[in-house]
Amino acid sequence: MYRIKDEWGEFLVRLARKAIEEYVRNGRVIEPPEDTPPELWEKMGVFVTLNRYRAPPQMALRGCIGFPLPIYPLVEATIKAAIHAAVEDPRFPPVRPEELDELTVEVSVLTPPEPIEGPPEERPRKIKVGRDGLIVEKGFYSGLLLPQVPVEWGWDEEEFLAQTCWKAGLPPDCWLDPDTKVYRFTAEIFEEEYPRGPVRRKPLV
């Protein structure tokens, strides 16, 4: 059962694209449209990902930032995440106007994270590649990987855990430490088929 209708997913992707283009070209932060569906004012976690069109998977990512927790209305969070992904991802320089025609926009709407309980060595059995995203936390360190990432890279559950630890700036086996907290979540993902093209629900398996 989907929480996000296909037409809402398309609305969010178009909104993210507009937010990015207005900010990159004009330095303007757009307001939520008047025709925003009421359901999209509910608070939800969301990430916006920018990919280089037709680039190999290892080279495709151009920016990805979002909010794991439902702290903003989804429509507002999408605008914020889109702009941040375009100009504030510390891994990349800000997106330039001439790049906009070569980037696809992807929006992932997240469920609230839930802790994975039990002995650490059982954690791989409690997650599923193609369904779950992960958050790893220990002390001041935290890292998140979206559900599509292990699918795109061909990881199994243990490698997914190790890579999320690495993303947090921790040793790759930190998921075996009882002091490390691991959370899982799911996401409904919508993407442009090509820059400014039709929007589709992204299958993970």
Curated annotation (Swiss-Prot):
InterPro entries: AMMECR1, AMMECR1_dom_sf, AMMECR1_domain, AMMECR1_N, AmmeMemoSam_A, Uncharacterised_MJ0810. Coiled coil: none annotated. Residues 7-201 form the AMMECR1 domain. It holds the Pfam family AMMECR1. Gene3D superfamilies: Hypothetical protein ph0010, domain 1 (3.30.700.20), Hypothetical protein ph0010, domain 2 (3.30.1490.150). Signal peptide: none annotated. HAMAP family: AMMECR1. This is Protein TGAM_1450. It comes from Thermococcus gammatolerans (strain DSM 15229 / JCM 11827 / EJ3).
